[in-house]
UniProtKB/Swiss-Prot annotation:
Span of the signal peptide: none
Record-listed Mg(2+) 1 binding positions: D190, E194
Binding site for Mg(2+) 2: D190, E226, E230
Gene name of the record: ilvC
Catalyses which reaction(s): (2R)-2,3-dihydroxy-3-methylbutanoate + NADP(+) = (2S)-2-acetolactate + NADPH + H(+); (2R,3R)-2,3-dihydroxy-3-methylpentanoate + NADP(+) = (S)-2-ethyl-2-hydroxy-3-oxobutanoate + NADPH + H(+)
Superkingdom classification of source: Bacteria
Annotated family: Belongs to the ketol-acid reductoisomerase family.
InterPro entries on file: 6-PGluconate_DH-like_C_sf (IPR008927), KARI (IPR013023), KARI_C (IPR000506), KARI_N (IPR013116), KARI_prok (IPR014359), NAD(P)-bd_dom_sf (IPR036291)
Name assigned to this protein: Ketol-acid reductoisomerase (NADP(+))
């Protein structure tokens, strides 16, 4: 894969351009402020009733409606929730785009699954920092940055890749490294990781471990500590140095037990189910299911949220976290 750094990106491809960032959430605030402080001409596009309008203005940014920001801009970055992007695009973005404009995204979902199909006269790019927005912002203010992905979907002007690299540089990303990919690979790996490992797999593993201990007669408090609370300690070791760092850092007892018992849990049958989940991402079945869920008023998701919130691990966890001074907001 191609990896780019400071010397490979030139802010000149954005200087003199009018840039609209649509959304001011986790990523939106980081993109807006980092580009603004990199000397670029940035406006934020929001719904007039959005509570984020005041926050953006307090940060020194100019705020207008989504339609006005798009009409004004040469480059439009869409950082709205996936499920909202299609409707906003059709109503407020598409009518205000002109040939030669650039449409940018932080995630490939709507382009890859053809929920949004821009005119062929418009550049379509992606700049995706591989961290939460607060870390994108913090590392920038410290003079550093986080690794980013870039991709080009359409390039009628011949400058799409250079614009994506310049954007990543303005975020601070070229100080860490910018990896070139495509919308398909970014979208499919992102969704699979969320479903099979990060959000789906890990949550179910935690609940199953907690339930196993409680059903065997152990106190809920101990089950919580062993199956939920201490997970952060292990994940931090993975994050800092991979599997080897974790195995080096834990006791020999933990290392041996994990290496000999772990494969009994994550069996070939589990991996086969992972492949099925990946296939549903690849062929669009998950995307269709999620879009239908959103259009239907989140009925299934609402039930799942309620079930999760009522799980015993949530109740004992809330009680135990009150004992942890570092978690109590002052």
């Amino acid at each position: 894969m191609n990896v780019y750094y400071e010397k490979d990106a030139d802010l000149a491809y954005l200087q003199g351009k009018k840039i609209a960032v649509l959304g001011y959430g986790s990523q939106g605030h980081a993109h807006s402020l980092n580009l603004h402080e990199s000397g670029l001409n940035v406006r934020v596009g929001l719904r007039p009733e959005s509570a984020s309008c005041a926050k953006a203005r307090e940060a020194g940014l100019e705020v207008t409606s989504v339609a006005e920001a798009t009409k004004w801009a040469d480059i439009v970055m869409v950082l709205l929730p996936d499920q909202n992007q299609k409707a906003v695009y059709e109503a407020e973005i598409a009518p205000n785009l002109e040939p030669g404009n650039t449409l940018a995204f932080g995630h490939g979902f709507n382009i890859h699954y053809k929920q949004i199909v821009p005119a062929s006269s418009v550049n379509v790019i992606m700049i995706a920092p591989k961290s939460p927005g607060h870390l994108v912002r913090r590392t920038y203010t410290e003079g550093n940055g986080v690794p980013c992905l870039i991709a080009v979907h359409q390039d009628p002007t011949g400058e799409a890749k250079q614009q994506a690299l310049a954007w990543a540089k303005a975020l601070g990303g070229t100080k860490a490294g910018v990896i070139e990919t495509n919308f398909k690979n970014e979208t499919e790996t992102d969704l699979f990781g969320e479903q099979a490992v990060l959000c789906g797999g890990s949550a179910e593993l935690i609940k199953a471990g907690f339930e196993t201990l409680v059903e065997a007669g152990y106190p809920e408090e101990l089950a919580y500590f062993e199956c939920m609370h201490e997970l952060k300690l292990i994940v931090d070791l993975y994050y800092e140095g991979g599997l080897s760092r974790m195995n080096y850092s834990v006791s020999d007892t933990a290392e041996y037990g994990g290496m000999t018992r772990g494969p009994r849990l994550i069996t070939p049958a589990v991996k086969a189910e992972m492949k099925k989940i990946l296939e549903e991402v690849q062929d669009g079945r998950f995307a269709k299911e999620f879009i239908d869920e959103c259009n239907g008023g989140y009925q299934n998701l609402s039930k799942l949220r309620e079930s999760n919130s009522n799980h015993a691990i949530e109740k004992v966890g809330a009680k135990l976290r009150n004992m942890m001074s570092w978690l109590i907001k002052k």
